[in-house]
């Protein structure tokens, strides 16, 4: 699942990286907000050249990255669902290892910047600080088995995604919400080292101060007692 917002400058390089590192069958769902997105003609040109693994899907939840990712989740078939940013920040060389952990029974596999062997290169220092602190404290003090709960670069089990009650409204809070709720509901989480690099083209839409209250909501939720019924969709709860 690839949420995009005017990533035309980055998409050719992203697709090249994907075809280099993902040497197994996959379908890439490019989820966009509006028909004028400059990613679309670039992706359409790749499709016109005979590429059948690339699918364009329009956000059905309302504009924004949360809706774009959820639209991709809805389109994804059963099995592992990988979320990849289009800004070339994610370490696609780690996907095979992430898939190995998924096949060993993990419901979420995190590409972790903050575990031993992981790296974060570039980006605003204060954003880095908050991200690192939240990931490490959730691991050390709550026992969530990843050092990087906030990273969007994750593999999710599609069936688990269908169980979790998603409430995120905006920003990249979605990845933290799902991780926290999956942990509290008893799903298995694992991680592997990953390198994150700040974008070199295009404009980031990350709005720290606007989205921080949403992150804090899920951060503090993590310290609640574990309870599957509280965090899965209502129709899945026992009557």
Regions found by a protein language model. Give the residues of each.
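Conserved sequence signature across two-component system core domains
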Residues: 4, 31-33, 59
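Short, well-formed alpha-helical segments that are part of the catalytic scaffolds
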Residues: 7-20
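Conserved donor nucleotide-binding strand/loop of the catalytic core
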Residues: 26-29, 40-75
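A conserved acidic beta->alpha catalytic loop
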Residues: 32-41, 88
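Terminal low-complexity segments of carbohydrate-biosynthetic enzymes
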Residues: 42, 104, 217-239
